[in-house]
UniProtKB/Swiss-Prot annotation:
Residues 175-814 are annotated as: Tandem atypical propeller in EMLs. The lineage of its organism: Eukaryota, Metazoa, Chordata, Craniata, Vertebrata. Its main location: cytoplasm. One of its GO terms (biological process) is brain development. Residues 103-115, 155-167 have a biased composition (Low complexity). The gene is Eml1. GO terms for molecular function: microtubule binding; tubulin binding. This is Echinoderm microtubule-associated protein-like 1. It comes from Rattus norvegicus. It is found in: Cytoplasm; Cytoplasm, Perinuclear region; Cytoplasm, Cytoskeleton. It comes from the Eukaryota. SUPFAM superfamilies: Quinoprotein alcohol dehydrogenase-like, WD40 repeat-like.
């Protein structure tokens, strides 16, 4: 080795090379002399390359020996206290390995983290150091291998858009958790990486991994769903004879009685609902859904469910194994008692099929179009006629036996539109279409030719047509946001314009009396009349939703999302108190303990503070240029901790009841992005989780990390939202990849714990949840990853938010 090191140092002895380069006589030397010198240099370089290879080999041997030594030390630690050997005997070349250049590939909780501020720290591996060198920090060996992305590989904003995330548990047998009674910790494994969690001293003697946790005595019941899916779905808004308005969002069909302010929910689907149809009896309803993937990787096929809107009982399920990707259009027949149902799926051929739904038999199917299909409906007087429309097509289908025969709509002198967007029928049986050119076209009954045209009925596309009971036609425009009524001769009667804040009209339905219901692309449901104003009865977010904050003393909560909206909701009245448009996509939020202000963090590193009463901006700051995943005020209201994707926690001093902020500093030490934060009851300590499963502790007032286990293990935490920790590790399913659980929340009474996962499920556990594979009550409703959960101030309700499904669900604790 000494020869190797001498050769290694000679690698940097460049005096002879510099002398050669600076020697003026070299220019006069013969070509033979130059060739000799080059040959000599090449020989020297080759020798030095050989020496480098020798060094690499020696260093690899040192790393191997180091791993063996640390494994032996870990075994000794488990067996009990032993006298530590001298450092030089145990780790002869520890300082060489600790330069941040090479790390062993085997995870070791004893190695110092190679991240930024800790790179040059030399930590001898003995038992005593093991207990103080951030012993709850995971140091996965693969971290340096991905040093190109030091902030970790997982981006919380990029989670899958559905419970059909395709995640599968690890195929290899997962490691079981281990318990060290001597040290008083439990070690669990996520993706094979150890996560060490120390328990309170008073639990060490009585704790057993084999003990079984119990289910909570309380349960959840879905009470209210906020939001509506109008951004990419059509014909999904109807009024039922019960006085309820029916629509859907996520995997829930909502039946909303506006007058009585009550909701009922059909929850038979297991993934996104995409279409809805009401039977002529106005009681039976059909809904179609997308394909999905269950938690264990099994395929969940798209299908149609037919159910009773009074009892909410499922009557029939059709199409399992037949539909592909999703069911996008459905309709009941009208003239034969509604015994037939047609459906179009989202396969490449957009297959149109006709079913006897009561027998669950398919009567016929045919390739409809290579392009998108927007609507399919039976003719009101001829059961055998079906009309479909979409991109570049309008087709009239005739059901004859087991076949469907097609006639294409002939536009003739009329310019063919790019999209035929909607279809309805007149009292005399004419077919009426609205298209992307803004024209209303009337197709004579029984023909595929245009009998009348209303040119330029709207500026831009016509997204919706609705034939009212009195024969009045109502059309809804997209670009112009206008609602126009037409008489039987297609003469304009009334015109109303929907305010820009509500967005383009997506669907139109008839309400009670002269009331019109409107669904918009910005996920509003409006009601009003053609001669009056339209007011929202339902609204929701329009883009991915992550931020959730609960008011400390009122039944209110705030949500914020990538749609740049922050909305304060009244959980009793089930309506927004106010809505604020901010300049950047929002990711996180947190209420000041006084409830007077609320902080909102964004994807850009900026954060805002708003007055809760007036929604006025109090202050705005910027910390870094990456997303702020957590905004958490201390219990005494004197500090604000901000967890960022730049791996730092920014600490601000707070005064004047949340209106004045002074930067204290930042806590640096994590080697991946911050995911969760919690304050101690006395506001003196902070615990944080990161994207690579680290658990670190801090004194935020000094921005210093706390590495003493004896200091941190008995801290009482004001909240428990960290997904990693002794009191919550039982929430993790066996074989989890460490990203399955997005949010954790402990109830204020400290008896319940809720989680939201990547499979659209909300779980309710007993707290503390410190037994492996703890049982839970499981609730469905979200179709996307559940991004956040939190209990209202009095623990009477739980709020959950969906990511891509943009829904907010309010669960009553019973």
């Amino acid at each position: 080795m000494e020869d190797g090191f001498s050769s290694y140092s000679s690698l940097y002895d460049t005096s002879s090379l510099l002398q050669f380069c600076n020697d003026d006589s070299a220019s006069a030397a013969s070509s033979m002399e130059i060739s000799d010198r080059i040959a000599s240099l090449e020989q020297r370089v080759q020798m030095q390359e050989d020496d480098i290879q020798l060094l690499k080999s020696a260093l690899a041997d040192v790393v191997r020996r180091l791993n063996i030594t640390e494994e032996q030390q870990a075994v000794l630690n488990r067996k009990g206290p032993t006298k530590a050997r001298p450092l030089g005997q145990t780790l002869p070349l520890r300082t060489t390995v600790n330069n941040g250049t090479v790390l062993p590939k085997k995870p070791s909780a004893s190695l110092p983290s190679p991240s930024g501020s800790r790179k040059e720290m030399v930590v001898p591996v003995t038992k005593s150091i093991n207990r103080t060198s951030s012993s709850e920090r995971v140091s996965p060996g693969g971290r340096r291998e991905s040093s190109g992305d030091s902030k970790g590989s997982r981006n919380r904003t990029g989670s899958t858009s559905s419970s059909s995330s395709g995640k599968k548990n690890s195929e290899s047998k997962p490691k079981e958790p281990t318990f060290s009674p001597e040290e008083g910790y439990v070690k669990m494994f996520l993706r094979g990486r150890p996560v060490t969690m120390y328990m309170p001293k008073d639990q060490v003697d009585s704790y057993s991994l084999e003990a079984k946790a119990e289910l909570p005595t309380k349960r959840l019941k879905l009470e209210w769903v906020y939001g509506y899916r109008g951004r990419d779905c059509r014909n999904n808004l109807y009024l039922l004879p019960t006085g309820e308005t029916v629509y859907f969002i996520a995997s829930v069909v909502v039946l909303y009685n506006v007058e009585e302010q009550l909701q009922r929910h059909y929850a038979g689907h297991n993934d996104d609902v995409k279409c809805l149809a009401v039977h002529p009896d106005r009681i039976t309803i059909a809904t179609g859904q997308v394909a999905g993937t269950s938690k264990d990787g099994k395929q969940l096929p798209p299908h149609v469910r037919i159910w009773d809107s009074v009892t909410l009982n499922t009557l029939h399920v059709i199409g399992i194994g037949f539909f592909d990707r999703a069911v996008t259009c459905i309709a009941f027949s009208k003239s034969n008692g509604g015994s037939h149902l047609c459906a179009v799926d989202d396969s490449n051929d957009h297959v149109l099929s006709v079913w006897d739904w009561q027998r669950e038999e398919r009567l016929a199917d045919v390739k409809c179009s290579n392009e998108a299909v927007f609507a399919a409906d039976f003719h009101p007087t001829d059961t055998n006629i079906i009309v479909t429309c979409g991109k570049s097509h309008l087709y009239f289908w005739t059901l004859e036996g087991n076949s469907l025969n097609k006639k294409q709509g002939l536009f003739e002198k009329q310019e063919k539109p790019k999209f035929v967007l909607c279809v309805t029928f007149s009292e005399n049986g004419d077919t009426i279409t609205g298209d992307s050119s803004g024209n209303i076209l009337v197709w004579g009954k029984g023909t595929n030719r245009i009998s009348y045209a209303v040119q330029g009925a709207h500026e831009g596309g016509i997204f919706a047509l609705c034939m009212l009971r009195d024969g009045t036609l109502v059309s809804g425009g997209g670009k112009d946001r206008r609602l126009i009524s037409w008489n039987g001769n297609y003469q304009k009667l009334h015109k109303a314009e929907i305010p820009e804040q509500f967005g383009p009209i997506r669907t139109v339905a008839e309400g009670k009396g002269n009331v019109i219901l409107i669904g918009t692309t910005r996920n509003f449901v409006l009601q009003g009349t053609l001669t009056g104003d339209f007011t929202p009865i339902t609204q929701g977010h329009t883009d991915e939703l992550w931020g959730l904050a609960i008011h400390a003393s009122k039944p209110q909560f705030l949500t914020c999302g990538h749609d740049k909206h922050a909305t304060l909701w009244d959980a009793v009245g089930h309506r927004p108190v106010w809505d604020k448009i901010i300049e950047d996509p929002a990711q996180s939020s947190g209420f000041h303990p006084s409830g007077s202000v609320v902080a909102v963090g964004t994807l850009t590193g900026r954060w805002f503070v708003f007055d809760t009463e007036t929604k006025d901006l109090v202050t705005v700051h910027t910390d870094g240029n990456e997303q702020l995943s957590v905004m958490r005020y201390s219990p005494d209201g004197n500090f604000l901790a901000i967890g960022s994707h730049d791996n730092c926690i920014y600490i601000y001093g707070v005064s004047d009841n949340g209106r004045k902020y002074t930067r204290v500093g930042k806590c640096s030490g994590h080697s991946s992005f911050i995911t969760h934060l919690d304050w101690s009851v006395n506001s003196q300590f902070l615990v944080s989780n990161s994207g690579d499963y680290e658990i670190l502790y801090w004194v935020p007032s000094a921005c210093k990390q706390v590495v003493s286990v004896e200091t941190t293990r008995d801290i009482e935490w004001a909240t428990y939202t960290c997904t990693l920790g002794f009191h919550v590790f039982g929430v993790w399913p066996e074989g989890s990849d460490g990203t399955d659980i997005n949010a954790v929340c402990r109830a204020h009474e400290k008896k319940l714990l809720s989680t939201g996962d990547d499979f659209g499920k909300v779980h309710l556990f007993s707290y503390p949840c410190s037994q492996f594979r703890a049982p839970s009550h499981i609730y469905s409703g979200h179709s996307s990853h559940v991004t956040n959960v939190d209990f209202l101030c009095e623990d009477s309700h739980l709020i959950s938010t969906g990511g891509k499904d943009t829904s907010i669900m309010q669960w009553r604790v019973i």
